[in-house]
Design a protein with these regions (language model features):
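Acidic, contiguous N-terminal accessory segments
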Residues: 2-34, 38-167, 175-176, 182-190, ...
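Conserved, mostly hydrophobic/aromatic
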Residues: 95, 165, 202, 223, ...
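Feature activates predominantly on carbohydrate-active enzymes
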Residues: 145-318, 326-336, 352, 501
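Structural preference for beta-strand elements that scaffold enzyme active sites
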Residues: 199-203, 230-232, 273-277, 336-338, ...
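Active-site beta-loop-alpha junctions enriched in small/polar residues
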Residues: 207, 236-240, 279-285, 342-344, ...
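Histidine/acidic-residue-rich catalytic or RNA/ligand-binding cores of hydrolases
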Residues: 287-290, 348-357, 407, 450-458, ...
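Active-site neighborhood of glycoside hydrolase catalytic domains
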Residues: 307-413, 419, 424, 429
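Flexible, acidic glycine-rich loops studded with aromatic residues
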Residues: 395-400, 409-546
Length: 546
């Protein structure tokens, strides 16, 4: 991860419909509705996003004029403008939820626009929220996003947002809110929108660098506006363990998040349809745990103690880590959990069996004479994934915890978070995809913001992500073949912040530094096609919608 590469140097390097190489369902939807697509959207950088704004007022839209496309980040995928007055917020504007289940979505939008929530039939000036086939299954709704799809109709001074699910309704409100911030109105017309990838997120290392609960919540609000839906928290590493633990209070560092703060974070994320994914990395990156449990420290034949490496030959090591995984499964109720698996120092030596004879002996005892330390490490990660599976979680692991060959094979179900092509064995993304694994893209060439820029890392730019990267670019700068690039194989991606040199930036500098890259990542996960807006125009738009 941006993590310890004291490892090898990683770098080597209204009218016609827009046809964007999208799936057949999208093309059919466009053909049926005659929707036109709008361009890309913008980026910026601040410590916390603004709650609402008055927008940049546009000239009144006359009945004979076509209004501008929505201003949203990420950009809407289909837009059809028609002649009409459009919508503006007035003193009579209300948000009208079509059911009690949408009341939370209605209240959030109403608070942002500073208007009331109301029951009953909608009227001119209102914003109506509802769920139904128009959002999830109609030609204009289900582009390919299911519950995250939505249809927004601006007609005769009223807005109607129909989502395939609650998330789709929420995303429709984001498009409306951002457009109002940028334009002060919403033109007459219809939006049909849905994400290209189901997993779209941000990964944050809170172990090496402490980030306050308020800072994390500010990012969640920012993520919600960007239609991102996952927040991965790297909870523990060699430097610290940053969350309160009742099963093992002895490992917890100061400062740390209390469980009450975590519940608050998880609750805010849920209100923005964001799943918080906890990561307790093992069998490496456990230095903070081992400080409290030196008896579990891995030792080499010469007595050396590789930092953060737990002795996976000891049953007590597995017991401790499993207890933490089970404890935090309840605290983080989402369907994913991350088991780590990267950079285990025992596998980063030239001859693991000679350097760590205790591990080699245990491997042979458990798996036969041909077994190696790699097999023992694979079995360790299998067991941790199994623990998470029993808790109802989908396990995710780093790609350098997935090894070629060996007596013991990685088990399923699990998803592979691909971050590096410089691990021992250097397995290409295509190798994982050929084997049937599903990948989440955290390509360190584009998506790693490593504090202090150690080991040839450089701070990523939003421009490179916006102009070059797509979910299919998993390693380096080259995409995987099209036959493996679909959303059923590459599930999405996450932009990641790692705190290798924690004091290199303040938390405020981090917030400002990641603002544009995070917006660009959101754009390309929502629609991976080359944006129609230039980068400079994208930046201007981000500033307007924030």
């Amino acid at each position: 991860m941006g993590r310890n590469w004291s490892k090898k140097s990683r770098r080597t390097a209204v009218g016609a419909v827009r046809r964007s190489g999208a799936p057949l369902a999208l093309t059919l939807a466009v053909s049926l509705l005659g929707l036109t697509a709008c361009g890309g959207d913008g980026d910026g950088g601040s410590d916390s996003p603004s709650a609402s704004g008055s927008g940049s007022e546009q000239p009144p839209q006359g009945p004979d004029r076509l209004g501008p496309a929505p201003s949203a980040v990420p950009s809407v995928r289909q837009w059809k403008a028609v002649r009409g007055p459009g919508w503006q917020r007035t003193d009579r504007t209300r948000v009208v939820p079509g059911s009690d289940s949408l009341r939370d979505e209605a209240k959030l939008l109403a608070d942002e626009l500073k208007v009331p929530v109301a029951k009953g039939p909608s009227r001119t000036g209102d914003i109506e929220l509802k769920r139904g086939e128009d959002g999830g299954k109609s030609p204009g709704g289900k582009v390919n996003g299911g519950p995250e799809s939505y249809r927004l109709v601006s007609s005769d001074g009223k807005i109607t947002i129909t989502g395939g699910g609650d998330a789709g309704v929420f995303y429709g409100t984001r498009t409306l809110l951002q457009t109002w911030r940028a334009q002060g109105r919403f033109a007459e017309g219809t939006v049909a929108d849905a994400p290209d990838r189901p997993q779209r997120g941000f990964s944050l290392d809170i172990a090496r660098k402490n980030f306050s609960a308020d800072w994390i919540k500010a990012r969640i609000r920012e993520m919600g506006d960007l239609k991102l839906n996952q927040l991965q928290l790297h909870l523990s590493d060699d430097q610290a363990f940053r969350v309160e633990s009742e099963t093992h209070p002895e490992i917890v560092s100061d400062p740390h998040l209390t469980k009450a703060q975590v519940r608050d974070i998880v609750g805010l994320a849920a209100s923005r349809h964001i799943t918080v994914i906890p990561e307790i990395d093992s069998p490496g990156h456990l230095g903070a745990v081992l400080k409290a449990h030196p008896e579990l420290q891995l030792r080499s034949a010469s007595g050396a103690t590789p930092r953060g490496a737990i002795d996976i030959s000891k049953p007590a090591a597995a017991k401790l880590v499993d207890e933490l995984l089970v404890e935090f499964a309840d605290l983080f109720p989402g369907k994913w959990a991350h088991a780590g698996g990267d950079e285990y120092q025992a596998l980063m030596t030239e001859n693991p069996e000679q350097t760590y004879p205790g591990l080699a002996k245990k491997a042979r005892e458990e798996f036969g004479d041909k077994a190696t330390v790699q097999d023992l490490a694979t079995a360790w990660l299998n067991d941790r994934a199994s623990t998470l599976d029993k808790q109802g979680k989908i396990p995710q692991v780093w790609n350098d915890g997935m090894h070629r060959g060996g007596v013991v094979k990685p088990n399923k179900p699990r998803e592979v978070a691909y971050w590096t092509g410089r691990e021992a064995g250097e397995r290409q993304p295509s190798e994982y995809l050929k084997e049937g694994w599903k990948i989440v893209n955290l390509n360190d060439e584009y998506l790693y913001y490593v504090l202090g820029q150690p080991n040839n890392f450089t701070y990523p730019t939003g421009r490179r992500i916006y102009e070059e990267w797509t979910p299919a670019v998993v390693r380096g700068t080259d995409p995987v073949p099209d036959k493996w690039a679909g959303r059923d194989r590459i599930l999405g991606g996450r932009f990641a912040v790692w705190g290798d040199l924690a004091d290199a930036q303040t938390t405020g500098q981090v917030a400002r530094g990641i603002r544009l890259p995070l917006a660009a990542t959101a754009q390309k996960l929502w629609d991976p096609q080359r944006p129609e807006r230039s980068w400079d125009d994208f930046v201007k738009l981000v500033d307007k919608v924030d």
